[in-house]
Design a protein with these regions (language model features):
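N-terminal Rossmann-like dinucleotide-binding module
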Residues: 1-46, 50
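Glycine-rich phosphate-binding loop signature in dinucleotide/nucleotide-binding domains
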Residues: 79-85
């Protein structure tokens, strides 16, 4: 990496807790990345105030003002490119992006999903993991591709499911892990340790055959 931090944009729909974790990590001395813009798809997103409190420029691309997905995606893409971001992190962004948008940002678009992908793509992941009797659950940071929740996984945070766990209890512990692994992945990419090469993930110059794993005693 060069001495200049990699500019990162974060896209949100809600309260922005993962965005705040990413942003706070970027404020640490020697961070290889800097959050240069937070973009929301609704004016009521709580994360806008969180970002502003950290001194991060914010903008809103209100999805309801656009007649279709294509026009919204085009406006969002223009906002992100105008920010100068080299990496875009979707953090609680509740829209499915078009294949055209994904292709435009190929190799520099991340998402976090609350399951150990490829398990439980889509919604209600915590309840589904409990119903299946799984021993472990967690979250995955992955590159975004046209396949929903199907891009190459970079890192997973994993925890053990406890006897008597509820979806809400598991969700709280998964969020703790999310706030660890998402900034970590941004750091790995910005420092050049993780790379996207023609649809594959490389770690320290070698193909990543399995996701990097983070297990936290506090979340176990």
């Amino acid at each position: 990496m060069t001495g200049v931090p990699m500019p990162v944009a974060v896209v949100i729909s809600g309260r922005g807790s993962n965005m705040e974790a990413i942003a706070r990590a970027s404020l640490a001395a020697g961070s290889p990345y800097k959050v240069v813009r937070v973009v929301a798809d609704r004016e009521t997103a709580g994360g806008i105030a969180r970002a502003a409190a950290l001194g991060i420029p914010t903008s809103v691309v209100p999805v309801r003002q656009f007649p279709d997905r294509a026009s919204f995606d085009a406006a969002l893409a223009a906002e992100l490119e105008g920010s100068g971001a080299k990496l875009v992190a979707l953090a609680g962004f509740m829209r499915i992006l078009s294949p055209e948008f994904v292709h435009r940002f190929e190799g520099r678009l991340l998402n976090i999903h609350p399951s150990l992908l490829p398990l439980y793509k889509g919604l209600d992941t915590h309840a589904r993991a409990l119903a299946a009797g799984d021993s472990h659950h967690g979250a995955s940071v992955h590159y975004v591709t046209a396949e929903l929740d199907g891009g190459p996984v970079i890192m997973q945070g994993r925890l053990r499911i406890r006897s008597g766990d509820t979806p809400d209890a598991v969700s709280a512990r998964v969020h703790t892990l999310e706030h660890i692994i998402y900034p970590h992945v941004c750091t790995l990419i910005a420092s050049g340790r993780v790379e996207w090469r023609t649809g594959s993930v490389f770690f320290d110059g070698a193909p990543l055959s399995a996701p990097l794993i983070e297990e936290s005693d506090a979340a176990a």
